[in-house]
């Protein structure tokens, strides 16, 4: 029995899940185009899908912003259909043995700064900048970095007057402790500067393989957050970035020097890394480390040049166009769940790909490194989506649980 959504999309197998819903592979019945379909039970205690869809709709038109194809209710479910995306940068980082080359880090930095700038231009801060929340596109957009998960996003200024939110302290804060800014740890209201500081830690994570405040032991998670905060504040930027080009320490020092309501100079930060890129003699061929593992050889120069031109055109037209989305959750619903959705007489088409184990920022529990790399490699070759990270459906509620340092859930300000 075929399960349909909006009488337009075929519901396939579950490919991910989150705190507030499940994500399925789907397909447009007419065109066959694969999509991601998020389902949330309408009876859930804290409905989030409608809020999330509103954020995505507000962001539509920017390069690297997943496009929304359909939203509505189907039986007992709230539904959001999005364009399908590939693996997250965390997936790819693990695939590349948890180390990126300088070239790959700089290629990513350029796009990631632009994604954050775009969100800020729409009057929101993301508040959960981490590798899991950046995904690569699929097919022709395989070299484009997308930003996802607005579950923790917040409006930082009025859309009409641009009046900035007031400075506050002693906040119960949300975010991911590993990449949180120092001001976030101190309980200060987040603003644009904090998204960019978090990105600085992400870039050094890609350079180093891990950050000095990873793996800290503590009796409770609350104490672990305190230790992360202490270690982060006691590690000078120059020590963190030692052995790497000075641009990385310059970037972090710049972010930390910003005042609460300052508008960051995004162009300056991009240019820092672009100048370094050119001095290193790198080429904007968009060959990332995982491409080398995928193909094992250099690509045709004509293909490289064509992709470069397409990427530049996408960036120029970013304010006028929308783009893609990420994969959603294993196996279609059965029994009572299936009966709540419309059905048709045709058989369910089989869907590709075994799941990629979501590793967060630690080695996978259930599969070996070799098995994980084999599965990611299969997806890279076949253009299949990666499994979504659990943070994709993270809610904005002040939930009571305290998560591990790499998990994006609200965490209490420890200094209160």
Curated annotation (Swiss-Prot):
Changing residue 38 to R: Increases PER1 nuclear import. The keyword Transcription does not apply. Its main location: cytoplasm. Its EC number is 2.7.11.1. Residues 9-277 form the Protein kinase domain. It catalyses: L-seryl-[protein] + ATP = O-phospho-L-seryl-[protein] + ADP + H(+); L-threonyl-[protein] + ATP = O-phospho-L-threonyl-[protein] + ADP + H(+). The modification Phosphoserine is found at residues 343, 354, 363, 389, 405, 408. The active site is at residue 128. Residues 351-365 have a biased composition (Polar residues). Autophosphorylated. Partially dephosphorylated by PPP5C. May be dephosphorylated by PP1. Residues 301-318 have a biased composition (Basic and acidic residues). Disruption phenotype: No visible phenotype. Has no apparent effect on circadian oscillation of protein levels. Mice exhibit a small but significant increase in circadian period length. Changing residue 38 to A: Decreases PER1 phosphorylation. GO terms for cellular component: cytosol; growth cone; neuronal cell body; nucleoplasm; nucleus; ribonucleoprotein complex. Residues 301-416 are annotated as: Disordered. Pfam families: Pkinase. One of its GO terms (molecular function) is protein serine kinase activity. ATP binds at residues 15-23, 38. The modification Omega-N-methylarginine is found at residue 382. GO terms for biological process: canonical Wnt signaling pathway; cellular response to nerve growth factor stimulus; circadian behavior; circadian regulation of gene expression; circadian rhythm; negative regulation of Wnt signaling pathway; positive regulation of amyloid-beta formation; positive regulation of canonical Wnt signaling pathway. Monomer. Component of the circadian core oscillator, which includes the CRY proteins, CLOCK, or NPAS2, ARTNL/BMAL1 or ARTNL2/BMAL2, CSNK1D and/or CSNK1E, TIMELESS and the PER proteins. Interacts with ANKRD6. Interacts with PER1. Interacts with DBNDD2, LRP5, LRP6 and SOCS3. Interacts with SNAI1 (via zinc fingers). Interacts with DDX3X; this interaction greatly enhances CSNK1E affinity for ATP and DVL2 phosphorylation, but inhibits DDX3X ATPase/helicase activity. In the presence of RNA, the interaction is decreased. Interacts with FAM83A, FAM83B, FAM83E and FAM83H (via DUF1669). Belongs to the protein kinase superfamily. CK1 Ser/Thr protein kinase family. Casein kinase I subfamily. This is Casein kinase I isoform epsilon. The lineage of its organism: Eukaryota, Metazoa, Chordata, Craniata, Vertebrata. The gene is Csnk1e.
């Amino acid at each position: 029995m075929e399960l349909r959504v909006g009488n337009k999309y075929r519901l396939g197998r579950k490919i991910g899940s989150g705190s507030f819903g499940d994500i399925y592979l789907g397909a447009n019945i007419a065109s066959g185009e694969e999509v991601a379909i998020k389902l949330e039970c309408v009876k859930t205690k804290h409905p989030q899908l409608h809020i999330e869809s509103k954020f995505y709709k507000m962001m539509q038109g920017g390069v690297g912003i997943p496009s929304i194809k359909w939203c509505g209710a189907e039986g007992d479910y709230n539904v959001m259909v999005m364009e399908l995306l590939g693996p997250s940068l965390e997936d790819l980082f693990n695939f590349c043995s948890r180390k990126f080359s300088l070239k790959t880090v700089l290629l990513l930095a350029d796009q990631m700064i632009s994604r954050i700038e775009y969100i800020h231009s729409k009057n929101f801060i993301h508040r959960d900048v981490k590798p899991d929340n950046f995904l690569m596109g699929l097919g022709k957009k395989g070299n484009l970095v997308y930003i996802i998960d607005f579950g923790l996003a917040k409006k930082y200024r009025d859309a009409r007057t641009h009046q900035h939110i007031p400075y506050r302290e002693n906040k119960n804060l949300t975010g991911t402790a590993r990449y949180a800014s120092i001001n976030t740890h101190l309980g200060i209201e987040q603003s644009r500067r904090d998204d960019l500081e978090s990105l600085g830690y992400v870039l050094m994570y890609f350079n180093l393989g891990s950050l000095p405040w990873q793996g800290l032991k503590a009796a409770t998670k609350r104490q672990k957050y305190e230790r992360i905060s202490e270690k982060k504040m006691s590690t000078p930027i120059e020590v963190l970035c030692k052995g790497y080009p000075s641009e990385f320490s310059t970037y972090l020092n710049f972010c930390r020097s910003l005042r609460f309501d300052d508008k960051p100079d995004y162009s300056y930060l991009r240019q820092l890394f672009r100048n370094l890129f050119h001095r290193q003699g790198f080429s904007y061929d968009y060959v990332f480390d995982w491409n080398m593992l995928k193909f094992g050889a250099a690509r045709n120069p004509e293909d490289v040049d064509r992709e470069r031109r397409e990427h530049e055109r996408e960036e120029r037209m970013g304010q006028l166009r929308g783009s893609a989305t990420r994969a959603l959750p294993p196996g279609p619903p059965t029994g009572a769940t299936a009966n709540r959705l419309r059905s048709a007489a045709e058989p369910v088409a089989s869907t590709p790909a075994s799941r990629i184990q979501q590793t967060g920022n630690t080695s996978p529990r259930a599969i070996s490194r070799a098995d994980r790399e084999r599965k990611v490699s299969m997806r890279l070759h076949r253009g299949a989506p990666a499994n979504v990270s659990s943070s994709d459906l993270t809610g904005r509620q002040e939930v009571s649980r305290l998560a591990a340092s790499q998990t994006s859930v609200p965490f209490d300000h420890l200094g209160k």
